[in-house]
Amino acid sequence: MQHNSLSQRNGQAAVEACSEVTARRTCFLSAHSYCCELEDGAIILELATGAYVGIHAEYLPHLRIRIQNWPDSHGSAQVTTNATITESESLISSLVDRGILTTSPAPKRSSTPPTPVAAMTTGSAIQRSGTPAKHLMQFMMSLWTVSLRHRDDQLASLVGLLSQRQHLIRRVQRTATLEDAKKMLVAFLRLRIWFYTADRRCLFDSLVLALFLSRKKIPCTFVIGVSTKPFLAHAWVQIGEFVLNDTAEHVQTFTPILAVGESN
């Protein structure tokens, strides 16, 4: 009996030791997971499914240490109490099981885009934008691409396509002026009114606009931002500090969680 009891204790100790090692594996946000911190915690966007996961602030001190490519906090979250290591490791294990975290090394995301300070005005470009019909084919191709893939499980492929197109624009180092961008924005707005409304369709509209500009070799940034209390997600397109399809005041109420384009 003593021998069996000793064996059981040794076996239990081995299991606990193994569990401890497993729990402390180096972790990374996976390639399709995007994260940002807010005052009351963090939000993770799981791009493969389009799902958002909320993380309470009490877990953040441990996650910042354990997840190697966790975004810079900049002291955004207000942490008053910390979760225990056991609780934090349980959360990490759950995120690994869901594919949100991985043990395979993944790079840290590049810096967030500049905060928009104004909406891009198009008044001076209206007369010089040309006939919208000359841009119709590029508009239709962009609209068609987004329409076919505008589902939560296809968002990753759209973001990937946009990233590739913007990377090619940066690689050839083509210089596009703000006037070029204004002309294309005017053409886009004139064409959009015949095909769909952007009301309550910020994600759809922003994807179509970003792809249209990319086809026209205009560097831009597609952004998804989030806020809490209540939770909201919003999408927009910007060039530098100018937002193209919203107001600066509105987008400033959101924290960018994903940015693809000129600033990345």
What annotation goes with each model-predicted range?
Residues A51, I55-S157, L161-R170, K216, ...:
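Long, charge-rich, low-complexity alpha-helical segments
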Residues A125-R201, V208, S214, Q238-I239, ...:
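Secondary-structure boundary elements
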Residues K216-K229:
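Short, well-structured beta-strand/strand-turn elements
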Residues P230-H234:
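A short, glycine/Asx- and small/polar-enriched loop/turn
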Residues F254-N264:
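Electropositive, surface-exposed helix/loop patches at the edges of structured domains
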Residues M1-I65, T122-L143:
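Acidic, low-complexity/disordered tracts enriched in E/D and polar residues
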Residues V53, L244-N245:
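Short, isolated positions in well-ordered beta-strands
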